[in-house]
Amino acid sequence: MQKWASHLCAPQVPLSLWIRSSGPPILLGLYCGFAATLPTGPFHVPSVRASVSGREGVSGRSVASSSVTGQPVIIPSAYSPHFHVVSVKPHAVTSSAPPCISLYWYRHRVGIEAPRTAEPRAVTAIGWAYAAVASRDTEVWVRRSTLLDIIILPLPHHVPVLSPALARLVRLFVLRHSNQFLLVISSLRGWSGGSIPLEYLATPLVVPKIDPTDDGPSEPPVEPPAEASTTHRVPGTIVTALRLLCLGRAPLPVLFRETRHEPQRSSGGGDQEDFSWLNAWPASAFDYQKGVRPFRYVTDGYNPGSSVKKELSQYHFCTVVGPRKQTLSLSSPPGLSIPDDNSDKSVNLSLLPTTHKEPPPCREWIRTGGRKESDSNNDSMNRTEAPREGYSLVKVVDSNNGLYDHGESVPAEIHDPSISNGSRGRIVGFRSTRLSTRRKSGRRTASNSFRNSPGAPVEEGRNTGNHHREHPLLFVDATRRNSYSSLVTRVLRTHDMIRLLCIIIEHKQTFRWILNVVNDLLSVGSSDNSDDAYAADGANDAATGGGDDTDDDADDDANAAGYIRSMKVRNVEYAVNERTGNLRVLKRPVLQPDYRRNLIAGLMRARRRKTLVWESLQSRTHSPLFLRMIGNSAPPQFSPGINAKAILTPHRSAAEEEDNKAKPVFRRSAKMATAKRIAAAKRWDFTTAHLTRGCSPIAQLYLRRNVILPTLTIFRNICYLIMFQKGEWGEDWNELNKEVYVGRSYDGNAAEVAKGLPRRWYRNGLQIKIVNPFYLKHRRHFVYGQSEPDDGTGINSTGTRNGMSKSISSYETNSYGNSSSAGGGMGFGHSTVLGCLAESPLGDRIKRPSFWKPLLMELGRVWWGNVPWIRKTHIENLPSRPAGKDPSPVGKADGLDAGTGKSIGDRVAGTRPGECGAHSAKVGGGISDLSIEFMPERDCPLAVSDQSEYRARMSTGELGCLVARGNDGASRVTGEFAGAGKAIAPFGPTGQDRGYTGGSGTAAPILIHRIVVRARGRCLRLLRVSTCFVQIPFSGFHGAAAPICRFLPVWFNIRLITRSTRRYVSKVRRARDLLAGRGGGDSIGVYSSRRDVRVISQAYVLSRAWRLSAVNKFRPADPEYGRGNPGARKSTAHLGVGGQGILGKRPLRALGGRYEWARDPRRYNVPSGIWCRIAPRGRKMKDEYPRMKDRELNKKQSMTLDEAICLRGIDPEPAAGVERSRKIDRQYGSNPPSKSSPDVVPDSSEIRGFAKPWRMGRGIIPNDRTRKHRERIVSGGGWDRPENRMNERKNLPFGSNIHSWLYIDIPERFHILEMPEFVATRYLGLACELNVSTASGYVCAGRGSARARVETEFREDRIEGRWDLGSKQVTVRARKMRDATNVPHAVFIGSNIEYPREGSVESTCESMSRDMAPPPYHAAPPDSTNGMLDGNRGHRATGVDKRFLKHKMLSVLPNFQNRFRGILDFIAYYEKSVPPRTGILEDGGDKTICPHSSHIGDVPLPKRRAGSRILESFYLAEGRSRGARSEGGTVEGHERRDEEPPVQNRNAEENETQTINSILRPGHRPEDPSRMNRPRFCTNNGSQFAAARVRIYPSAGIFMT
């Protein structure tokens, strides 16, 4: 009896108060009504049939009395646990049901025969026989027999009535409802499914067939309803009853009674605790899976030395994750719901008593946590079904319960593949999985707060053990208190020991002091100290790391103690808090988890059953790879308050490092990425997918080992033999044999592939790790001494800064993750699905320098010198041009360096400013000296160490050189031969070896070369592709637009043609130009076939090339990148015979002249073919054909926007605000261009000197930081007439250098959301796609056409139009813009922020919408309309010129659709010393978070914003002294130098690094955020200016600090 009674010990099902009070009476009434008014079973059949037949003797009173008499038997059997157990248990029902049915049948059979003997003519049926008997004694006997039938038969009857098989179907549809409500449906289904079938099945049994030969009354007898033999009916009835009894077992309603927290003492007064299983409803009795679950034998009572153990079903246990390990814990009752948002829902706080007898700490805890009602859940969903259902993780909210100690706690993330995601989330005994301590790490009293509380009852004369047994919950964590029985509480005490061990490890320095407290805690209630010693030794081993006992010893100790087996604390790492210095313990995943550690010490039968259950659960759990993919907790080094450098982590595998990568910064992007990752993981988390994915690395492994590597080795050594060198067979085979292949599953199991794969690799996922991977490398240094083919950039990828050759093997030394550079180190890699090597299983592919390229170069060099016909073929056909060092160079200059050698001051070793280097070139086999002027600051970029940076800069150099020498036309070379003076070449070789070998030197092959060049150009023109911005023929920009080709075949053909002919054509052009220059005499200028060149800014060309090339993905790490940019070439084109060129000799670059040089727009002579493709539309319309030879007159070669205004025939007058412009100009001259800010010009009506139509139309011209005194050319008569010139006043608020580059057709509509997205804000020509064909026609048409086009543009875009800022349309669109950009508007502040101050903060977009109006009129703060432009208080203009509004909006809202998605930088917890970055916006009761620094400058710039980076590269090319004046400087430069104070120069010099950092790295935040980190808008004349900062203007509110 004790065995099956122990199964009934279950926690109480928590119910609401109204259910507990009103549920049982209502349900009892329903049940009584069913039993009293409806036919409830076959015992009513005789009475009903007698009443219907109308026979005398049996009236309605008999039927009513029989129903009422049966209720006292039915009700106790349904509501009394004792009767219920006897009736429901299968063994009891099986033994009681057949005798009852047999006795019923036999008694009626005997009762029928007896009346037949006395009265032969009487009807021998049950009811009819009673009615036909006239004797008084016979009637009494019949009534007594009927009463006896009613009493006996209802005992087993209520089982099929209440819960038949149909009731199971109801539970599938009615989920998460109260078990009491489910009873009502079960009763209805039970009556219809159990009572009616039994009635009709029992009717033929109890009413046998009457023999017609018997004598009877004169009336005809009533035929029985069925014809069947009695022997066939009895077994059928018994089988039907047995089936219904076994199918229906559902919990019944019961009036719950709250149990006291104090254990109930037995009547004998002994120390053992009574089993209080009758206090709670025995829900475990209906566990339909209990047959497959093992039993746990746990100690009954609090005496650890007691040998009395009781059997508890496995139903009450589940696997949970604690702070340190997985352990068995009591599962929640079947009625509890799965925790979703807070683990407090799994604790029934409402059942805790709140009387004054409870200790004060308990009441305080109840008030803090709050009373939260638990949700009900379907009891069919238990713990063993959780892995199969795939529940999500529990989101524990620690900020509400105070466990998250303001950034000092570290989340302990455990990746253990032993259990699934759903089981991990079902934590019952813990409110949080985080380890949290107080701020101070000093000694604290580790005692329970309830032990010494004033209200804790302590009886005198009792020892400590009795006190602990009397009040067991005083030693359990308060967060784990629930209305469990005392036995449950005893099992939960195991968690306290585990948590205490975690605290011991955190504070090693106080271990000896805490150990005494542990011993005192473990010695509670026991005089035997064997368990204390065991626990103390285990804690000591866990804390000191010395617990290395075997599992057998641990099992013996656990069996002796009767506890849950404890896991040794290992595989931990430590993290140190930077602020407090506290030590944190982090649990790392156990590679090979042992299922036995979760077993209760007991019989081997339990272990065997546990193994079977574990294996069955493992087949339904998620794979370890899935658990890794869905893990989204940030690593501890990214937690608040934790210093990443202070984390002491041991060696980790590559797979573990992959899990600790940083997560996205913005919350929205992080959630989206997590959702996609989890969806993909769930979609591919099945055995077939893992098997397929695992087979691919295995196939790649064998293919690599047996096919690929041997083939490459053989081919490599054959190449060595062809080069007449010794092969390296032995070395290659030895290294190949050193490769070791290790198969690893994602749960940590590893095995060598040669010996077998890991267990269950097809389920857990497989990855192949290659130890000592073999790769082809050069063991000789003959290849590295040679220079690479000339690419026209002067870049030497193998040289160092000291001029020495560098071996490529330095790149290959650390090709793999952990390879050692000291030699002999063990490298490793991971094979991917496609057979490539990666640094980690899910990491990036390992990239190494090319092995075959230098080998083929060496092969060509060797055969070049040995076979004569190879040389001839190479001259004419080979694409590459290998050449050796010049044996007798006349002069050398340091080439473009790409090495990593060290140099003093991190400068490039080269010639000093003003020096010229001499180079030699071989033409036709001879040596000709050609002196080339060479500027190291422009021609030599800084050295880089990364190959990707090297290639990126090489692409930039190629584009710059291409612009310098034209598209497919000949480069212009003006030179003098050696001994005759110096010559200037457009692009000279700068490396040590730039000789050109071969070539006959005659004019005969030139014609053939021209044919080849033309054919190549025609082929490339047929393969044009459209890029994002303009259509570019790939005759020149092959490397720029190849990454963005639309079709792979086109891309392949273009690369094939360009690579095969690029070197060849380049060599032919150089040779032709040199030959032409030699025969022309002294200082002969060579005309170009294309004379329609345009002078453009180098800043614009470089930024344009940067944007169109692969460099858009490259961000230079060094701000001094561009000090020697190869694109910064000096113009050398000549327009006539003789002279020095358009710009003449460029002055020496002094230390202070870099800003003038950066702003100088004349840098390149670009042919119109290229100019039509890269120039903006507005610029192309205003440029003129450069016919001026004089440098001073050349300044007036372009028609600007100002001149276009003057062309309308109105002489401008002096403008107002000149003094203000002078001050700004002085400030601009004393600071770098990147620090300057735009100024807004007042209304044009107040400016004197503008055209009258502009005044009438109230047109406002955007301001642009003009230079001092400029001369303008006006229309009328001729361009050179003095009367058509006018001298403007100094510092007018408009100029020519900027507007000529900013002109654009701006959309007429005020609809920001539909405007094109800007790639670079101030390059406004990119706002609309350019029409190359139309633009090229403008340029080629000449000056008159360009002038007419300007006037046409002004007519089309009338400036007289005005926008009414108070209109409803503007208001609606501005509100739409605000909603689209105001990310903080959607953030809701919870109620957990204490003491919020009332106030409002203007949002980002509201400030921007107000800033679009002219600043002189927006002094008034926004009104209650939340900053909308729908009111006029007299301080803001209701109308504004649309041209100015367009310009202003483009200045304030650059590409806002992409930049205002993640402005919010919310820091929830901060110290008082650090001001908060967030504020509270409260408008009409709504609270939102708005950052104080929410302006455009804080938003990271897009990747393609390369213009500012390029312009900043020009700044540091000069020295630090800005006072020095360059040769040929202007008078304005003298004045500006004299006016600027030296203090400003020093300040600008000190802040130069921060300024450049803010541009190169937008996330950089210097000390002064008001001046730094602002968006720079670069202009094409080399200058920059920042947009007006969008600040937050408080509107009658106070910021929260």
From Swiss-Prot:
Pfam families in alphabetical order: Ycf1 (PF05758)
Keywords carried by this UniProt record: Chloroplast, Membrane, Plastid, Plastid inner membrane, Protein transport, Transmembrane, Transmembrane helix, Transport
TM spans (from-to): 25-45, 68-88, 147-167, 181-201
Cellular component GO terms held in the UniProt record: chloroplast inner membrane
Signal sequence interval, chain numbering: none
Biased composition (Acidic residues): 548-558
Record field: compositional bias (Polar residues): 794-806
Region (Disordered): 209-231, 351-388, 411-470, 535-558, 787-806, 879-916, 1216-1244, 1521-1574
Quaternary context: Part of the Tic complex.
PANTHER family found in the cross-reference section: PROTEIN TIC 214 (PTHR33163:SF40), PROTEIN TIC 214-RELATED (PTHR33163)
Function of the molecule: Involved in protein precursor import into chloroplasts. May be part of an intermediate translocation complex acting as a protein-conducting channel at the inner envelope.
Similarity-based family: Belongs to the TIC214 family.
The name this protein goes by in its record: Protein TIC 214
Organism of provenance: Selaginella uncinata
